[in-house]
Curated annotation (Swiss-Prot):
One of its GO terms (cellular component) is fumarate reductase complex. InterPro entries: Fumarate_red_D, SQR/QFR_C/D. It holds the Pfam family Fumarate_red_D. Anchors the catalytic components of the fumarate reductase complex to the cell membrane, binds quinones. It is found in: Cell inner membrane. Belongs to the FrdD family. HAMAP family: Fumarate_red_D. The gene is frdD. Disulfide bonds: none annotated. This is Fumarate reductase subunit D. It is a multi-pass membrane protein.
Length: 121
């Protein structure tokens, strides 16, 4: 029998943010840490002298600001989704309070990162 009025769920939103955060954390974050944290400050390429003013200019640019916000917020959404489901796997059932506490923490990081980047520009 076909159910013509299926139950609505907010789970696809959280799974979408979880997936985006996981991909970002696996593909983009290691390259960012390698370049911005190790190679460029140590003059690994010998062509770019990176300093505070250049990083500030990058983050102040709209594309750099968006990159910074995504680098901070998407992995946080991924982590909080893992925490939420990890608590469930450990038989710690907090219900919707735990669910929204985890996602509220990720939303708070997103808002704070956005405000920080906007204040820089």
């Amino acid at each position: 029998m076909i159910n013509y009025s299926p139950k609505r769920s907010d789970e696809p939103i959280w799974w979408g943010l979880f997936g985006a955060g996981g991909v970002w954390f696996a593909m983009i974050t290691p390259v960012t840490v390698l370049l911005m944290g190790i190679l460029l400050p140590l003059h690994g390429f010998g062509v770019v002298d990176i300093g505070y003013d250049k990083v500030y200019a990058f983050v102040s640019h709209p594309i750099g600001g968006a990159f910074t916000v995504l680098s901070l917020s998407l992995p946080m959404w991924h982590a909080m989704h893992r925490v939420h489901h990890g608590l469930h796997d450990l038989q710690i059932h907090l219900g919707t309070v735990g669910k929204y506490a985890c996602y509220l923490a990720a939303a708070l990081v997103t808002v704070l990162a956005t405000v920080w980047v906007i204040q820089l520009s």
